[in-house]
UniProtKB/Swiss-Prot annotation:
It comes from Homo sapiens. The keyword RNA-binding applies. It is found in: Cytoplasm; Mitochondrion; Mitochondrion matrix, Mitochondrion nucleoid. Its EC number is 3.6.4.13. This is ATP-dependent RNA helicase DHX30. Changing R785C: In NEDMIAL; changed localization to stress granules; decreased RNA-dependent ATPase activity; by inducing the formation of stress granules probably indirectly decreases global protein synthesis. RNA-dependent helicase. Plays an important role in the assembly of the mitochondrial large ribosomal subunit. Required for optimal function of the zinc-finger antiviral protein ZC3HAV1. Associates with mitochondrial DNA. Involved in nervous system development and differentiation through its involvement in the up-regulation of a number of genes which are required for neurogenesis, including GSC, NCAM1, neurogenin, and NEUROD. Residues 1-10 have a biased composition (Basic and acidic residues).
Length: 1194
């Protein structure tokens, strides 16, 4: 059995036997950080002495062994400490030894450990007094002291000084002058990209802006070589100013030249007997000679070095504190040259034939000089009423036009319901008695007497399935069943469908048609009159658009209100206002746990009825118990370490081992495992399948996630065959939303995914965080529904006490653009702040304002927060406002189908991606993308291929296609449903003549669907300002200039490309401009996971906002007024024509938004067709390729 302590003890004994020399005494920082977790002063001093320690270690071992890198001899092992990152560096040459380093970032900890190792090397005599390297022959002799094998040595070629510095002209001694970039930045340049990103980088332009504001004196030039021999007093004063001059010189040269040693660039020659005369020849920054004398050799050399330091300071090459400058400052001239290159506009050359076509078009269809894209505010007198929702009221139950029942019809229907109810007796008797049943009269009377009632029921009390039936029963048995029309909301699709099916079964065959459900992409509504409709919250919000007072509905039951999801909180605002419009409506809020008194206060002190639940005993085990059961005592210390620092890392191997242990030794029955997200579900599923191997047929491994269509999740509710154990892998969807009756064992990771919005960076991050205590109670309760059970919590008992009582409401931690848009649809007369201030928990006003600004920026709201004509169209499309905008524009630009596919795939990933196969998925995406430089077009090709095999191929071919392209069939089915739904939305918004046109290749809305640059450009126009400009060169936080790296600049600052986007690994980009949908924050950095290269002319012609032109009559530049991301240059005629073409495109969009698109006059359709043909031809031209000159690991 592995033991970390015994491992270390054995290694120490081995080292004692292996080396005759006593083990070195490690400096304090190599053992422990200071008590507060900060890095000690000794550690900082080490980094001053060894400014590039990893580079130096690699150089020593590389020189000694004659190898190009020392990866196998230096192993960095990372551990997370209480407050700091910890790195243990295992050194395998010249003997096995370990040192430790600490830092707030992984790279900092590695540098600390490497610096400690450098100190050891220096103590062992492997480095010279100025940290210089020796030749291989000397290392051969030194190695014999350590017992290193001799056969691993060979003699490398002697290292020569960097050519660029040896051949410096005296004219070029100013820092950063020519030659400063001729040498590579060494191995430390090639750090793993993610570690480098953690340390923070800025692009060249930002760095130059910062240096212009720096208060340091400007660096001065020196002309010609110099020879300095001053009197001894001057040398003594210089030595007083620079007490360690050799070290300082070495560090300056190492940093400036990115070299591991300064030996070849600073050479001492000392002569004399009683009085020593030392001559220092300094080859950097240009040949200089310094002479000093002393009684001893060391004294004379130190004085000469001090004079050199004084000279370097006079040149501005040492800072005011007598410390070296950064590598970037030494290469400032190269930085400025690169910055100047970045600032130059991109040259555009449009072929003459296309320019003539543009001129002809503009002459035939001139854009009035006074035409400006107007503020498209909703005004009933001049804008076409949009959408079918503006017609008669819709019946919330059936979706058909609402017509109140005549009295005679109501009586007849009520009588029919009563007869059916009386005939269902035996079926009702079969339903088990639930804890809620004895409270039926109390509950029903409260609902009858109060407009709002809160029902708090423990898990298993039966409130979800039984209370709707109790309401229906009372109305039917009292002869007024036709008046009972209940809408019950559920937070998730799977729960709405499963609960509807359960209630339908309990009511029996005669009343089954009175129960129905409606969720996204699936609908089976009940008949009106005596109806129970189960739906998601989003569906009810849509129904409120077409029937704002919910006429025809007797009760609304909002279930699982304690989850506090953003849609439910939004619905409560509307329902609270609805009481004035429809006082007869009864509202019931049902909660399993949570602060129910808060809901009561929100609704004016409405009654709260508490229903106790019944749960069989559940035996609980915590992490310390579980590790003991599994025989993993050695891991307890590590997990306690994680516990102390609030780390939310899930060990999937431990989860798998626990499930297998339960299967081998636990009671019969189902196992329900709560995991944070889809990646963890897939990871555990794959591990279980690998572990079970040929015995997998004895197990039913069922993932439960919103990514999976309902039809693929029905098996979780079914009893498995005899001898087969059910293993359900689920997110928190299984806490309260669904009930799986045969679960006996619950494995609780204690984690879930939670979206959080960073107001500063304006990006969301989906973080894995600890659940609340209320969640733990709910999860535990899943094991005791139908029999005694067991709960296994993968966290210590002490963690339970640290958990928050309840989750933070989603409305307080997510972006609010969708919510603000919904508010404008339901209550356009109220400002967003005014509307959302009425929520149970009001969001931060700044977050609301940010959402309004974004919607104004993309043209959905005007300055007075009214919906524009674009906003009215978007209101019909159920997705993110930016994606909805892309769909609207795609209909206008006649490339609709590929955009529908892209938006659907951004909603639901079609690839079967897991923690294990991410690299393979990335390769498949790159192949599907071809040379388009687009993750989004990879989606289009993947779905197109799937549609092709569905149409023409047999089942075997379909399975092969899925396997070869790592696609997930349930997700593809869901995507197909989304495309169908969006097609209906587009039809409702009057953008197509009929829904089927959206996917028809021959339809006008798809005339240019094969034009890839146009498709990407329209996507960019929808997502704008989500635009990236790729820039060459960057500067790290430590001040290292990396000219061969790239940065990715957005309007709000630098971001990073995630490994999952194909453009991350590209060595040549067809365009320097990328668009993206979502940026996420992880470990302090902002990442983009999906991107597409876009034509610079698409950016110019299709984005919102103004452009700025500078024209001298011959050449002209044109740029976006709202950012510095695009500057194009061309001859004056070309720029003028492009500006007019841009205005013509704006006019086309505005006309299309103000009319029913399919009903535009033929002359206008013809004009638009010619314009789009011109645009497509223009975008087929070259983008101006961009070489991404990256280092090996960039």
């Amino acid at each position: 059995m592995f033991s970390l302590d015994s491992f270390r003890k054995d290694r120490a004994q081995h080292r004692q036997r292996q080396c005759k020399l006593p083990p070195p005494r490690l400096p304090p920082m190599c053992v422990n950080p200071t008590p507060g977790g900060t890095i000690s002063r000794a550690s900082r001093d080490l980094l001053k002495e060894f400014p590039q320690p990893k580079n130096l270690l690699n150089s020593v071992i590389g020189r000694a062994l004659g190898i190009s890198h020392a990866k196998d001899k230096l192993v960095y092992v990372h551990t997370n400490g209480p407050k700091k990152k910890k790195v243990t560096l295992h050194i395998k040459w010249p003997k096995s030894v370990e040192v430790e380093g600490y830092g707030s970032k992984k790279i900092d900890a590695e540098r600390q450990a490497a610096a400690a190792a450098c100190q050891l090397f220096k103590g062992w005599g492997l480095l010279g007094p100025r940290n210089e390297l020796f030749d291989a022959a000397k290392y051969r002799v030194l190695a014999d002291r350590f017992g290193s094998p001799a056969d691993s040595w060979w003699r490398p070629e002697p290292t020569m000084p960097p050519t660029s510095w040896r051949q410096l002209n005296p004219e070029s001694i100013r820092p950063g002058g020519p030659g400063g970039l001729s040498r590579s930045l060494g191995r430390e340049e090639e750090e793993d990209e993610e570690e480098e990103l953690e340390e923070g980088t800025i692009d060249v332009t930002d760095f130059l802006s910062m240096t212009q504001q720096d208060s340091h004196a400007p660096l001065r030039d020196s002309r010609g070589s110099s020879f300095e021999m001053t009197d001894d007093d001057s040398a003594i004063r210089a030595l007083t100013q620079f007490p360690l001059p050799k070290n300082l010189l070495a560090k300056v040269i190492q940093i400036a030249t990115s070299s591991s040693t300064a030996k070849n660039l600073m050479q001492f020659h000392t002569v004399g007997t009683k009085t020593k005369l030392s001559t220092l020849t300094l080859l950097w920054p240009c040949p200089m000679t310094f002479v000093a004398k002393g009684r001893r050799k060391a004294e004379a050399e130190n004085k000469a070095a001090a004079l050199a330091c004084k000279k370097l300071k006079s040149l501005g090459l040492v800072d005011r504190n007598n410390e070296p400058l950064t590598h970037a400052m030494y290469n400032l001239a190269s930085l400025r040259e690169l910055g100047e290159t970045q600032r130059r506009p991109c040259t555009i050359q449009v072929p003459e034939p296309i320019l003539r076509k543009i001129e002809t078009f503009l002459n035939h269809y001139p854009v009035e000089s006074s035409w400006i894209a107007p503020e498209l505010r909703l005004q009933s007198d001049d804008i076409l009423p949009l959408g079918k929702d503006s017609g008669p009221l819709s019946d919330p139950i059936t979706g058909k036009p609402y017509v109140p029942l005549l009295e005679a019809e109501e009586v007849r229907l009520s009588q029919s319901l009563l007869e059916l109810w009386r005939r269902r007796g035996p079926v009702w008797q079969e339903a088990p008695q639930l804890p809620v049943d004895p409270h039926r009269d109390t509950i029903l009377n409260a609902i009858e007497q109060h407009p709002v009632v809160v029902i708090s029921g423990d898990t298993g009390c039966g409130k979800t399935t039984r209370i709707p039936q109790l309401l229906l029963e009372r109305y039917v048995t009292e002869g007024r069943g036709a008046r009972c029309n209940v809408i019950i909301t559920q937070p998730r699709r799977i729960s709405a469908v499963s609960v509807a099916q359960r209630v339908s079964h309990e009511l029996g065959p005669s009343l089954r048609r009175n129960v129905g459900f409606q969720v996204r992409l699936e609908s089976k509504p009940p008949s009106r009159g005596g109806a129970l409709l189960f739906c998601t919250v989003g569906i009810l919000l849509r129904k409120l658009q077409s029937n704002p007072s919910l006429e025809g509905v007797s009760h609304v039951i909002v279930d699982e209100v304690h989850e506090r999801d953003v849609n439910t909180d939004f619905l409560l605002i509307l329902l609270k206002g609805l009481q004035r419009l429809n006082p007869a409506l009864r509202l019931v809020l049902m909660s399993a746990t949570g602060d129910n008194e808060r809901f009561s206060r929100y609704f004016g002190g409405c009654p709260v009825i508490k229903v106790p639940g019944f749960m069989y005993p559940v035996k609980e085990h915590y992490l310390e118990d579980i590790l003991a059961k599994l025989g993993k005592h050695q891991y307890l210390h590590r997990h306690r370490h994680h516990e102390s620092e609030d780390e939310c890392a899930l060990d999937l191997d431990l989860v798998t081992d626990l499930v297998l242990h339960i299967d081998a030794r636990g009671e019969p029955g189902g196992i329900l495992c709560f995991l944070p997200g889809w990646q963890e579900i897939k990871g555990v599923q794959q591990r279980l399948q690998e572990a079970l191997g040929m015995h997998e047929s004895k197990y039913l491994i069922l993932p439960v996630h919103s990514n999976i269509p309902m039809m693929d999740q029905k098996a979780i509710f079914q009893q498995p065959p005899v001898g087969v154990r059910k293993i359900v892998l689920a997110t928190n969807i299984a806490e309260t939303s669904i009930t799986i009756n045969d679960i006996v064992h619950v494995v609780d990771s204690g984690l879930h995914k939670e979206e959080r919005y960073d107001l500063k960076t304006k990006v969301s991050c989906l973080e894995t965080v600890w659940v609340s205590r209320a969640n733990v109670i709910q999860r535990r309760g899943r094991a005791g529904r139908c029999q005694s059970g067991f709960a296994y919590h993968l966290f210590p008992r002490s963690r339970l006490e640290k958990m928050v009582p309840f989750q933070v409401p989603e409305i307080l931690r997510t972006p609010l653009e969708n919510l603000v848009l919904q508010a404008k649809i339901h209550m356009p007369e109220k400002t967003a702040v005014e509307f959302l201030s009425k929520a149970v928990d009001s969001p931060n006003i700044k977050a609301v304002d940010e959402a309004v600004i974004l919607l104004q920026e993309i043209g959905v709201l005007d300055q007075r927060e009214y919906l524009t004509t674009l906003g009215q169209r978007l209101a019909h499309i159920s997705t993110d406002p930016r994606l909805a905008k892309a769909i609207v524009l795609a209909a206008i630009f006649r490339c609709l189908h590929p955009l529908l596919v892209v938006v659907s795939c951004l909603t639901r990933d079609p690839f079967s991606s897991s923690l294990q196969n991410r690299a393979e998925v990335d390769k498949v995406k790159a192949l599907l993308s071809h040379d388009s430089g687009s993750d989004h077009l990879a989606f289009v090709r993947a779905v197109a291929g799937w549609e092709e095999v569905l149409r023409w191929q047999d089942r075997s071919s379909r399975e092969n296609y899925l396997e070869e392209n790592l696609l997930y069939a349930p997700s593809l089915r869901f995507i197909h449903g989304l495309i169908k739904q969006f097609s209906e939305n587009i039809y409702e918004a009057f953008l197509v003549g009929k829904p089927s046109d959206c996917t028809l290749a021959s339809a006008q809305c798809n005339e240019y669907s094969e034009e890839e640059e146009l498709v990407k450009g329209v996507l960019m126009a929808g997502l704008y300002p989500n635009l990236i400009q790729v820039r060459q060169g960057k500067v790290t936080r430590q001040g290292k200039f990396k000219p061969n790296s790239v940065t990715y600049r957005t309007k709000s600052g630098n971001i990073l490309l995630h490994k999952s986007t194909i453009n991350r690994e590209a060595t040549r980009l067809r365009s320097r401009w990328l668009t993206y949908f979502m940026a996420v924050k992880s470990n302090g950095s902002v990442f983009v996971r999906d991107s597409s290269q876009v034509h610079p002319l698409a950016v110019l012609l299709l984005t919102d906002g103004d452009v700025h032109i500078r024209d001298d009559g011959r050449r002209a530049t044109i740029s976006l007024s709202d950012s510095d991301l695009l500057r194009l240059e061309g001859d004056s005629r070309t720029v003028r024509l492009l500006k007019e073409l841009r205005r013509a495109l704006g006019r086309m969009v505005e006309r299309s938004l103000r009319s029913e698109l399919a009903a535009l006059p033929p002359s206008v359709q013809e004009e638009h067709g010619q314009l789009l043909a011109l645009l497509a031809e223009l975008l087929r031209g070259p983008c101006g390729s961009f070489d991404v000159r990256k280092t090996a690991d960039d």
